């Protein structure tokens, strides 16, 4: 930049360790630790002004150094052939050294930021678990995830600690028939807590959904899915939206080259989906506009 070439050559030993313990057939425990370099984007190093979008300006910091992260994880997996039970659990922890953080300022709706190597330690803890079992032609699954993050933010020249905790629980039941219709019932429950010092927010999301597919007369394939999502904003208000799609395909037989399909999207003609969330410097609402009810006819030829 400006007819000046910058090179940064360095030598650093980064440990990487993994061990696996086979507890018994189909059951294992794996421990992993590694230290990694984290390099930033070149736009954060540029000497000048970067326009991210209409209300966000960014100034580069050419003296930035790479950051380091310590990462440790423990995984447990088990599969039982006798009762068709599958269990998987993963716990992970990471912390950052000299993490690259932004110095953010707001003037009305205009956001300006520059960057520096922070001496404050940021941490992240995550836990994921899945238990799955098959009962004949029915498969039951429950997924659980918990994530905690601690981030030091710098807004309007002041340092503050941002803590976030997200919990998600998703039970599901699905059939697995070869000829008969199959149905999947799922329920997602999520709680997001965010503490930005003098401001605390809690979002509770509930989302039941159903998927259905059927193979009819060995010629027609019918598929449909429906979901309903509601989000509690924590202040007595809530928002909700739903979505429904369906399709019907025809193929004369399994060896036929041609397939004909009619597909309908957004059958309920929903205008938009509204979601609320929070990051390390703000709480925001995002609205995704959805294409109106849309029906297509498709012709598929298999070579």
Residue ranges: model-predicted function:
Residues 1-303:
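Exposed, low-structure sequence patches enriched in small/polar residues
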């Amino acid at each position: 930049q400006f007819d000046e070439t910058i090179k940064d050559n360095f030598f650093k030993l980064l440990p990487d360790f993994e061990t696996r313990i086979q507890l018994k057939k189909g059951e294992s425990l794996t421990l992993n630790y590694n230290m990694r370099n984290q390099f930033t984007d070149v736009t954060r190093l540029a000497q000048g002004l970067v326009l991210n979008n209409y209300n966000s300006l960014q100034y580069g910091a050419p003296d930035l150094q790479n950051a380091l992260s310590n990462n440790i994880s423990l995984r447990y997996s088990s599969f039982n052939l006798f009762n068709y039970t599958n269990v998987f659990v993963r716990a992970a922890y990471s912390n950052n050294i000299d993490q690259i953080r932004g110095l953010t300022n707001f003037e009305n709706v205009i956001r300006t930021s520059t960057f520096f190597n922070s001496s404050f330690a940021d941490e992240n803890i995550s836990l994921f678990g899945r238990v799955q079992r098959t009962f004949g032609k029915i498969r039951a699954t429950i997924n659980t995830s918990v994530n905690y993050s601690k981030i030091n933010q710098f807004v309007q020249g002041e340092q503050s600690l941002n803590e976030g905790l997200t919990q998600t629980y998703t039970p599901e039941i699905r059939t697995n028939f070869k000829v008969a219709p199959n149905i999947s019932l799922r329920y997602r429950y999520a709680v997001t807590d965010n503490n930005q010092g003098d401001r605390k927010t809690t979002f509770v999301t509930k989302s039941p959904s159903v998927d259905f597919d059927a193979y009819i007369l060995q010629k027609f394939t019918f598929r449909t899915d429906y979901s309903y999502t509601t989000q509690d904003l924590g202040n007595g208000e809530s928002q909700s939206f739903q979505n429904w799609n369906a399709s019907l395909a025809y193929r004369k037989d399994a060896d036929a080259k041609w397939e004909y399909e009619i597909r309908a999207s957004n059958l309920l003609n929903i205008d938009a989906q509204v979601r609320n969330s929070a990051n390390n410097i703000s709480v925001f609402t995002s609205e995704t506009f959805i294409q109106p009810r849309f029906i297509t006819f498709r012709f598929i030829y298999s070579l």
